[in-house]
Amino acid sequence: MDFRDYLREQAELHPAMKPQDAMKMIYQASFGAEHLLEDEEAARNYLIQELEQVPTTTRIPLFEDISEDMCRVNLGAWKGKGLPADWLFKIFALSASEHKNGEETFVKLLEEADDAAARGWLEFTHEEWQEYKKEYLKDGIRAVHHSDSYRKAEAPAYRLAARCFCRLAPVLEKAAGHGPAVIAIDGRAASGKTTMAGALRLILDGSVIRMDDFFLPLELRTEERLKMPGGNVHYERFAKEVLPHLGRGEAFSYRRFDCSRMEIDSREVEVPPSPWQIVEGSYSHHPELGDYADIKVFSDIDAQTQMERILIRNGEEMAEILRSRWIPLEEEYFSTYKIAEAADVKV
């Protein structure tokens, strides 16, 4: 989809859209919401007040995409799912960082809006759009409110968010219904497990334990061990150094496997105290670790996108090693233990 498609989709969802509302969408897609966060405490309090006042609903989508990178989070739907205001504010604040090339993006999206209006895709004529655009540009690029007619008909109540946070919604819903918990994120290589864990850490003020720190040492990589599904993770050390601390919210430390030296590092990884503990990485749902996780998440990806990401991230040589050796081992583990099927949440 390009921006014209997002405009068209918004026009279909909200027939009261006027040229002013399209311009607001262009500005939001280009610059985000940084201008709304000059006073974080005031912005937080305003969100809490607005959530208290907005009607609870399950009839509208939680997210509405407005560009390739940005979406609107509907407050009524957020409230309807019982999600905390503080989590939404953190998502909003994390999404409001300075957008690069904002003016360049604005000019590009303006051209796409011209084309969408000329094609008759929007709820106003091309002439109306051109007239509004001309008047708007006289005072330079700036944020605008929704039009009066849009506010009256649509009663917009939302916050902007980066679309990367949309993927977390099912996990956050599960977490909200559970309370402080141990979350384990398993899944396919390059599916976004690390990114997801990092985002959850920021939203939940959580701590992260990485399964990459528990690669199997060379001396344990016997033919017999590697024939075992999921045998290439050092689950014995994880069980000894990590499991006793999970679910307690306490600070602790563990040793990490140093891939550059192919041995366990004597320096320890410090895990800060937190009621939300996130175990991230392949084999984090291994049955040898027991049923330690309160919420099991499986992160999925299709094979083509997976290899495209691995090529960009790791280069051709490592991509071939992953494709021919490590990914088949992962897939055998997923299949043998029905890892995806046993997860509480699949994203």
Language model segments and positions:
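Pre-Walker A (Motif I) flank of P-loop NTPase domains
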Residues: 178-183
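Conserved nucleotide-sensing/catalytic segment adjacent to the nucleotide-binding pocket
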Residues: 207-210, 216-270, 276-277
